[in-house]
Curated annotation (Swiss-Prot):
This is Acetyl-coenzyme A carboxylase carboxyl transferase subunit alpha. Acetyl-CoA carboxylase is a heterohexamer composed of biotin carboxyl carrier protein (AccB), biotin carboxylase (AccC) and two subunits each of ACCase subunit alpha (AccA) and ACCase subunit beta (AccD). The keyword Isomerase does not apply. It comes from the Bacteria. It comes from Nitrobacter winogradskyi (strain ATCC 25391 / DSM 10237 / CIP 104748 / NCIMB 11846 / Nb-255). It catalyses: N(6)-carboxybiotinyl-L-lysyl-[protein] + acetyl-CoA = N(6)-biotinyl-L-lysyl-[protein] + malonyl-CoA.
Length: 320
């Protein structure tokens, strides 16, 4: 059987079958049979099949990969990249929102403010973090942290992974749209460097509220869009089953967005996606963040602010 801890997507069935065969042969080898050459041969086939498959993913398949339950989340990146991380809670107006986590720590020896959505990895944690869908108090907490970072001249890192801001009645009553707008404005107004990395789903205003940054990086199989493919197909065709078609037409992949100038760089994932080798992806992401911060190091506060604002004005003019 394939690794019981590994979750395969529907389109990965050929790879799952090869992995299953490898496990069967390994079980035979453990009983004394000398079949190492056969195992090696099938392992090579499985690796090549995975490489070929992921080299030609459709936008809808990338959407599935971006949502993979074993994909590294905000907390994994923080554990792998940030030392002495101290989370801060509450918006000082209503309460705490655990869908959006933020705090201060050290990145490669230097102080940094980190904010981002956490989806959770288990049923209990997903409920605790509301599947990464932040409420108004989450975005107001982000504004509070960005204000602190700006005051103490500490760069800001945003790790984006959310299907979107929470659309519940309570969230709307507490000013969800206003909170998103103020968070977006806080990003644009920072006098310190800020880097955003789309690590999974970058959904709508819930994503851009913390992603209007000097540099926007995106993992190879992440997605970034104004609306989910399912919702778009329901609106455009009154049929959610057309999500695959919507995903293609919406241009939500890193490759499309780099071509349009919406993002600045694509971070390579291993064959099979980030969930196949989280440690490697996290390390590569750390190097990219360090490089981006270094590029911005010599810019003064006004230049950082102007570069960021002009970046998004140019996107609007180009794509508007």
């Amino acid at each position: 059987m394939p690794d019981p801890m590994r979750s395969y997507l529907d389109f990965e069935k050929p790879v799952a079958e090869l992995d299953s065969k490898i496990d069967e042969l390994r079980a035979l080898a453990a009983s004394g049979s000398d079949i190492s050459e056969e195992i090696s041969s099938i392992e090579e086939k499985a690796a090549q099949a995975l490489k070929d498959l992921y080299a030609n993913l459709t936008p809808w398949q990338k959407t599935q990969v971006a949502r993979h339950p074993q994909r590294p989340h905000f907390s994994d990146f923080v554990k792998g990249l940030i030392t002495e991380f101290t989370p801060l809670a509450g918006d000082r107006k209503f309460g705490e929102d655990e869908a959006l986590i933020g705090g201060f720590g050290r990145f490669r020896g230097e102080s940094i403010c980190v904010i981002g959505q956490e989806k959770g990895a288990t049923t209990e944690s997903r409920l605790k973090h509301n599947f990464g869908m932040a409420r108004p108090e989450g975005y107001r907490k982000a504004v509070r942290l960005m204000d602190m970072a700006d005051r103490f001249d500490i760069p800001v890192l945003s790790l984006v992974d959310s299907a979107g801001a929470y659309p519940g009645i309570g969230a709307e009553e507490r000013g969800q749209a206003e909170a998103i707008a103020r968070s977006t404005d806080a990003c644009l107004s920072l006098g310190v460097a800020n880097i955003a990395v789309i690590i999974g789903e970058g959904g709508s205003g819930g994503a851009i509220a913390i992603a209007t940054a000097n540099r926007v990086l995106m993992l190879e199989h992440a997605i970034y869009s104004v609306i989910s493919p399912e919702a778009a197909s329901s609106i455009l065709w009154r049929d959610s089953s057309k999500a695959q078609e919507a995903a293609t037409n919406m241009k939500i992949t890193a490759q499309d967005l780099l071509r349009f100038g919406v993002i600045d760089a694509i971070l390579k994932e291993p064959a099979g996606g980030a969930h196949r080798d989280p440690a490697a992806v996290i390390a590569l992401t750390g190097d990219a963040i360090a490089g981006a911060l270094n590029d911005l190091r010599n810019l003064d506060r006004d230049s950082l602010r102007q570069q960021r604002r002009q970046k998004f004005i140019d996107i609007g003019r180009k794509l508007g």
